[in-house]
Regions:
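A short, N-terminal "cap"/entry segment at the start of jelly-roll beta-barrel domains
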Residues: 1-61, 163-254, 358-376
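Conserved short histidine dyad/triad with adjacent acidic residue
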Residues: 46-53, 64-81, 241-246, 257-275, ...
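Conserved metal-binding segment of the jelly-roll/cupin
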Residues: 70-72, 108-128, 139, 264, ...
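Polyanion-binding and phosphate-handling cores
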Residues: 58-63, 76, 82-85, 104-127, ...
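A short beta-strand-loop-beta hairpin characteristic of the jelly-roll/cupin
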Residues: 75, 80-110, 120, 272-303, ...
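Beta-sheet entry/capping signal
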Residues: 85, 113, 133-134, 278-279, ...
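Double-stranded beta-helix
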Residues: 2-4, 121-199, 316-376
């Protein structure tokens, strides 16, 4: 069990007002209709190509978290990722397009989450009436950069923009020399584009967890205790839920799990530790995180803030507001997560008829045998 100071805890709180945008993060930054796109690197660098990008929390987490903000009509052009890319819509309406020419689409609205497969072209446009906001989660600490659609690279060259082999943006209008052949990213050949896998809208819909798809259920062994009963709706992989009936719709390896946590007014998740780094992004204000066994360090989160909880630190999550809140929970790793509740919580839950089975899921206490044999 680790202990954290208030100063250390505050340094892991990236407030919404702390996010710093970059408008020259990608090679399409001068393309009309894309020039007003804002890129944010909140945890890790993401896939930015700009040396001007500010990274709020550069510490490695096993995944990257960023954001994109765009006025109505602005487009993020077609590109390929090598690791998982997950879009979490928090504000506005976005039309996501995929395919070699962006021929397929899905419209995302606040609360919707889309995981786009690797090695296919994808892009999106703000089709709403106001400025939109998308959080993104990328797999791995090193995402490998991106490959832009050949048309984008050809057009960028007309504006004096190139990408180096190490994913750095080269702007000849600022005095950067034109990179020679072998030193820059060349447009993908037609025959290579033709080999990319295609996904039908029906297949992609299985990689969407829309607001109406979410399956909220009581999630933890402390649900039998007063003031508890927090609910989780799985999105990707094996998360922190202790409910055996929870099954995430998106199950291929991403390098992280993702879930929605819902807390009613004054409701809490009792003190527990986790062996993995855990990031929370609330949709609404009111989440208070109390840290350490003594709960002597607290952090209050506003809407759309990002907070990173270190591994092996005791934490309590509580809704201090007077309306229900939803919080996105992202945890590193593809394995089943194992929250460890404090001993007094486990004992109180047992006395109220609930315990955990050997797989780490909630069960009725009177059904569990006292089986002490373990493999040597």
């Amino acid at each position: 069990m680790n202990r954290i100071t208030q100063t250390e805890a505050d340094a892991r709180h990236v407030k919404r007002s702390d996010y710093q945008s970059c408008t020259v993060a990608f090679i399409d930054c001068k393309k009309p209709g894309s020039h007003l796109k804002q890129n944010y690197s909140i945890i890790g660098p993401g896939v930015t190509s700009s040396s001007e990008q500010v990274i709020n929390l550069p510490e490695a987490h096993g995944f990257n978290i960023g954001a994109a903000a765009m006025p109505p009509g602005i487009t993020n052009n077609l590109h390929i990722h090598f690791t998982a890319e997950v879009f979490m819509v928090y504000g506005g309406e976005y039309t996501f397009r995929w395919g070699s020419n962006g021929e397929n689409e899905f419209v995302g609205r606040p609360g919707d989450i889309l995981s786009v497969p690797t090695w296919i072209f994808r892009g999106f446009v703000n089709t709403g009436e106001d400025d939109g906001w998308i959080f993104t989660t990328l797999g791995g600490d090193n995402t490998g950069g991106v490959i832009f659609h050949p048309e984008i690279l050809h057009e960028a060259a007309d504006y004096g923009l190139y990408l180096s082999k190490d994913n750095q943006l080269i702007d000849t209008s600022k005095g950067d020399p034109v990179p020679g052949e072998g030193q820059r990213m060349e447009p993908m050949a037609e025959q290579d584009v033709a080999k990319l896998r295609s996904y039908t809208p029906e297949e992609m819909r299985q990689r969407v967890v829309a607001t109406q798809d979410r399956d909220f259920r009581p999630a933890f062994v402390d649900a039998v205790l007063d003031g508890c009963g927090a609910e989780i709706a799985p999105v990707i992989g094996f998360g922190i839920t202790q409910n055996r009936d929870h099954v995430a719709r998106i199950r291929n390896p991403h390098g992280f799990s993702m879930e929605w946590l819902r807390l009613q007014p004054s409701q809490k998740v009792s003190p527990f530790t986790l062996a993995d780094k855990m990031v929370v992004i609330p949709r609404e204000a009111g989440l208070r995180i109390s840290l350490n066994d003594a709960a002597d360090v607290t952090v209050d989160l506003g809407e759309w803030d990002t907070y990173s909880i270190p591994a092996d630190v005791v934490r309590v999550l509580q809704n201090t507001g007077d309306t229900a809140i939803e919080v996105l929970v992202i945890v590193s790793g593809d394995h089943q997560k194992r929250p460890e509740f404090r001993g007094d919580v486990v004992e109180a839950a047992f006395a109220s008829g609930a315990t955990l089975d050997a797989q780490g899921y909630v069960a009725e206490a009177h059904l569990i045998p006292n089986y002490g044999m373990v493999a040597e």
